[in-house]
Amino acid sequence: MNPNFLDFEQPIADLQAKIEELRLVGNDNALNISDEISRLQDKSKALTENIFGNLSSWQIAQLARHPKRPYTLDYIGYLFSDFEELHGDRHFADDPAIVGGVARLDGSPVMVIGHQKGREVREKVRRNFGMPRPEGYRKACRLMEMAERFKMPILTFIDTPGAYPGIDAEERGQSEAIAWNLRVMARLKTPIIATVIGEGGSGGALAIGVCDQLNMLQYSTYSVISPEGCASILWKTAEKAPEAAEAMGITAERLKGLGIVDKVIDEPLGGAHRDPASMAESIRGELLTQLKMLQGLEMGELLERRYDRLMSYGAP
């Protein structure tokens, strides 16, 4: 199976394989088969639109985890100039599962922070599969407080299965680090915009997700636990993950309807990994619009708005 396609995309993968075969035949034999290729491309587009127009919550969860999906550093490359990565929490270590630093968005200085998964095996291990340890969250907190001092807006990119649950992380105060970030972010005197670009897993996501404006990409997820974890608790088997995903309401549109998400950013047909540059431009437009709005608020109004937003969660 083509690793660029998920199970439910197999019919699309089959059509793409036929198109590639025809291209090779045409190149080898100098045959003009452009009409047939064009017909198959139209068929592939229509099939993709049909499949992606009827995705289940579980299928969206799979897309959010797609190995080719753009990560934080990919978007930093597309969106920002003069990015200077900053390291270390000044307490214990540097955590590669969270990246952050100063950059410019259309010439204006910003602080960028986000989870970072890995592509290859070694990088995945080095970045702990995007699951931060306490030092990652403390690094993020240090950078956010720096942004406040220098009056820079904070832009965060969320993409994690969750905070690392290992013994070493617990020994170094994982829950305290997350809780401290929530406290600090609620009070920071600078605009904060968070964007969920893949998985938004529980407290590991929320620790850089307290904000004035929350965006989610169309095929991202945000939840208190993974569908597999929920299924294992409720049904005693991870095989019930599709049912759990539906019941939990983890998708961008569901969360927008609940008032948790402010903006759902549409993805290119087939997902962000099909056209990362186009996806980045859509994100750029939203960030610039939202920054202009937030920077136009008085500081007291900004903080009151943020507080009211937090207090509204879970209210009838």
From Swiss-Prot:
Any one GO biological process = malonyl-CoA biosynthetic process
Q: In which pathway does it act?
A: Lipid metabolism; malonyl-CoA biosynthesis; malonyl-CoA from acetyl-CoA: step 1/1
Q: What Gene3D superfamilies does the entry give?
A: 2-enoyl-CoA Hydratase, Chain A, domain 1
GO cellular component assignments: acetyl-CoA carboxylase complex
Cellular location of this protein?
A: Cytoplasm
- Which UniProt keywords are present, listed alphabetically? ATP-binding, Cytoplasm, Fatty acid biosynthesis, Fatty acid metabolism, Lipid biosynthesis, Lipid metabolism, Nucleotide-binding, Transferase
Task: State the Gene Ontology terms under molecular function.
Answer: acetyl-CoA carboxylase activity; ATP binding; carboxyl- or carbamoyltransferase activity
Q: Which Pfam families match?
A: ACCA
Q: Which reaction does it catalyse?
A: N(6)-carboxybiotinyl-L-lysyl-[protein] + acetyl-CoA = N(6)-biotinyl-L-lysyl-[protein] + malonyl-CoA
The CoA carboxyltransferase C-terminal domain sits at 39-293
Please describe what this protein does: Component of the acetyl coenzyme A carboxylase (ACC) complex. First, biotin carboxylase catalyzes the carboxylation of biotin on its carrier protein (BCCP) and then the CO(2) group is transferred by the carboxyltransferase to acetyl-CoA to form malonyl-CoA.
PANTHER family tied to this protein: ACETYL-COENZYME A CARBOXYLASE CARBOXYL TRANSFERASE SUBUNIT ALPHA, ACETYL-COENZYME A CARBOXYLASE CARBOXYL TRANSFERASE SUBUNIT ALPHA, CHLOROPLASTIC
**Which family does this protein fall into?**
Belongs to the AccA family.
How does this protein assemble? Acetyl-CoA carboxylase is a heterohexamer composed of biotin carboxyl carrier protein (AccB), biotin carboxylase (AccC) and two subunits each of ACCase subunit alpha (AccA) and ACCase subunit beta (AccD).
Q: What is this protein called?
A: Acetyl-coenzyme A carboxylase carboxyl transferase subunit alpha
Q: What would be the name of the gene that encodes this protein?
A: accA
